[in-house]
Amino acid sequence: QAMGETQDVSLVRSEFTENLNTWIKLNNMSVVGVEPKIYTLPTKLKCICRNSKCNKPCPLAFSATNPEFAQVVDVDPRQLLRFMDSADSAQDSYLRQVFGCKSVQAEPTDFINCQKIIFQESASFIDGLEEASFENRYGVYMYTDYRLSATLKYNFEACRVTNPSTQQNYYLIRDAECVSVPRPDISEELLQHFKSVGDSCETARALVQQYYEEWMPELAIEGRPDLFGAILLTYCSVTEIPWQGGVLKGWLDTMCIGDTRTGKSQMAQKFVKAVGMGGYINGENARRTGVIGGVQRFGDSWVVTWGAIPMNDRGLLMIDEASGLEVEDIKDLSSTRSSGAVTLNKIVKGEARARTRLLWFSNPRSGRNLSDFYWRGFGAFQEFIPVMEDQARYDLVLSAAREDVDILNGIDVETHVNLGPWQALFSLAWSITSEEIKISKEVKQYVRETAKSLNEALGGGPLVVGVAVHEKLLRLSCAFAIACGAYDLKNSALELTTKHVRFAREFLEWTLNKPSMGYGDYIREFKRAQQKRADNMQFVRTLIAVHPAIKALLTATSFKGYQFQEILGIEKNESSKIMSDLITRGLLRPGSGASYIPDKLLMEIAKQMEV
């Protein structure tokens, strides 16, 4: 079959019997794993007769003296599979079968390299489940120069054949074209819509609300502008950001935790499906090997098979029902999410890039509602991932409670969003390099000042960490710059302004101070408790400095009231006042039998001050 005659077929349809031994095109195939072995196999075999005493009329008998009679056989693609992992005698056996003569011997004249690969269809629910297959398929890629790389997407020209030895199906691939994220052909007219919205809005809420109203007919979910804004900003986030001579990660890691039936997953699924960019996995039936990667047996070799995060490098992945992932699995993702690379050191070693924008959606692990947690959404988030290091990896954490939306007004679904400009905008964001992002000295100073004030207001917890606040602000600022159409086509530059940084701060405060999130209340209580602890420590240190003998009492597990007066050698009134102050501050509590029990803090300070 000629190259031009191949037809586009889905992976499912390629398995119909009518497509056996037929060259077809398989588009958007993701290479999940590659075998490290390289095979070099003959594609043409010259036939030689090894029987000098043969007197039968045969063209091979004259080929030694008459080269024009030489017989060269093109090896059938199916037979290449037979030659793999076989001795040279397999080639002789093949020719003897073709000629029906035991005297024929093979002499290879042309060769091709072959690489065993594991691949799957890269389509998720975007193209409809009935036409997509998520199971791994086995292939053999024929090449002369460069091998295929794992985690990349390709358009294959392939033929499904059966292995003559085992009858197992393989896809023999003669041509593979890499499908990279192309730099969009974007114009000033296309960017103008985003620029006009960005210029007209003075607050982050106004910008998000205007885009939300534009998308409302497509999403059909009301009352969730903060969630829409988070999805939009995650899509608009860049890959790398220049900062102080180095490069920071630019892709956003967003988490939404909420009650069931609040539309959080539905909104994200509709957005991903409409845009047609990004992958999807369900955490309920996924483990670490499916998210990061693992090793798989392929013939007599072990092959690294990469998971959903590295397979969506420089793209976006939505993890739905994330509560299905174990805490240990999420902890294992920590290094990957911060560095943008995956390293597997198992039976075989493998490395892959994983600069993947992540959208996590989850219900509370315990099945309770957000309103049942003391700290509302933040309490449910702490239950979801109790390790502070992993909590800090999330750039945005949002809540979606039932009580957030009172009444649904209904949506006019007659209009649809114009997807072309949005797809071009997201492709632009995903392909921008760190050299194209321009941050002036004035903006850098404003970022530092904003980070400092934000840390004073909301610092102390895992979601606003003092030394890393500027990184979170920069990621959100660059995403807002993209959403505002601030890309200069003439100079190929994304200019960051103080307005974008202000929008980033506003959005962070909006999500964290939301009543159903409860993070602002948690931080205020945390800071009050910290201040109280500091005051108590100062009070106890002063008390010990004035009455050194009190250390003997405070290091005891309990003591009687009269012992306080006797050991300190003070009047009863003064003794009562000191004990009253300690009880009021929560440093001393009454026990059974007229005894008093010192608080742990009190005992710690007393022990620290022992010489």
Map each language-model feature to its residues.
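OB-fold and OB-like single-stranded nucleic-acid-recognition modules
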Residues: 1-211, 327
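Conserved ASCE/P-loop NTPase catalytic core
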Residues: 21-64, 207-432, 436, 544, ...
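Intrinsically disordered, low-complexity regions enriched in proline, serine, glycine
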Residues: 166-169, 370-371, 489, 591
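Short, glycine/acidic-rich hinge or "gate" loops at secondary-structure transitions
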Residues: 168-170, 244-249, 488-495
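Short, mixed-charge aromatic SLiMs
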Residues: 251-267, 492-516, 603-609
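Basic, amphipathic alpha-helical bundle interface domains used for macromolecular binding and assembly
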Residues: 356, 361, 369, 391, ...
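Short, cationic-aromatic polyanion-contact patches
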Residues: 593-611
